[in-house]
A protein has these predicted regions:
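Phosphate-binding loop of NTP-binding sites
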Residues: 172, 183-191
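Short beta-strands and strand-loop turn motifs
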Residues: 163-167
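Phosphate- and divalent-cation-binding pockets in alpha/beta enzyme and binding domains
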Residues: 41, 78, 126-129, 173
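C-terminal helical cap/extension that packs against the catalytic core
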Residues: 104-160
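Short polybasic amphipathic segments
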Residues: 1-2
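Nucleotide phosphate-binding/pyrophosphate-handling subdomain across enzymes
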Residues: 8-114
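A short acidic, helix-capping loop that chelates divalent metal ions and anchors anionic groups
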Residues: 65-66, 170-173
Length: 191
């Protein structure tokens, strides 16, 4: 049988970022279509869908800078997805509890997209050393998340994004990734 292409949505219409999220939308849309849901209903639903909290969650825009909370990016693989989802120059807040991860792949994923790496937590020196070894030197060390958000706000240019996608667990500074993400949102809103 011949396959028919049915346009449902353009990725620019979606409120969620990231190729992995767009692939999930395509899968859900295909299943809904084959279950008999109208193209119009599918389009409306996928265009209204927003990110789950702490997963590349859009927080706000201030002074032309977009802020994203990806606190659930608690390991390098998950945090890579956050970086890949950004479509602007990015100031990346990373670091936290040391789970003995390698950060090389995460740092290599910056690929010219990350302007500054702003580090907090137990892993900040370890990540800084790995980044410098790999040739990334635009690094700022901070005492805590509040300072990191403030530094990012000062360094960011209109059109940039500030992304909390730490590649580390939250323990030591926060009870869990939800608390870390909620604090990030509070600090951003207080700017």
């Amino acid at each position: 049988t011949e396959k028919e292409e049915i346009p449902i949505v353009k990725t620019g219409e979606l409120k969620i970022l990231g190729r992995h999220n767009h692939e999930n939308v395509m899968a859900a849309a295909a299943m809904a279509y084959y279950a008999g849901v109208s193209v119009e209903s599918i389009h409306k639903s996928v265009c209204e869908f927003v990110a789950v909290p702490h997963r590349i969650e859009y927080v706000t825009e201030k002074n032309g800078v977009a802020y994203y909370n990806d606190s659930k990016g608690t390991n390098p693989d998950a945090a890579i997805k956050g970086i890949q989802a950004m479509n602007r120059p990015t100031l990346l807040i990373g670091g936290g509890y040391d789970k003995e991860s390698s950060y090389d792949e995460w740092i290599e994923s910056f690929d010219g997209k990350v302007r500054y790496l702003v580090l907090i937590g137990q892993t900040k020196e370890k990540i800084k050393a790995a980044a410098e070894r790999l040739g990334f030197t635009d690094i700022i060390l901070c005492e805590d998340l509040k300072e990191a958000v403030q530094i990012c706000a000062e360094k960011a240019n209109p059109g940039d994004a500030v992304l909390l996608s730490p590649a580390c667990a939250s323990w030591g500074q926060f009870d869990n990734y939800e608390q870390r993400g909620d604090m990030f949102k509070e600090y951003v809103k207080a700017l």
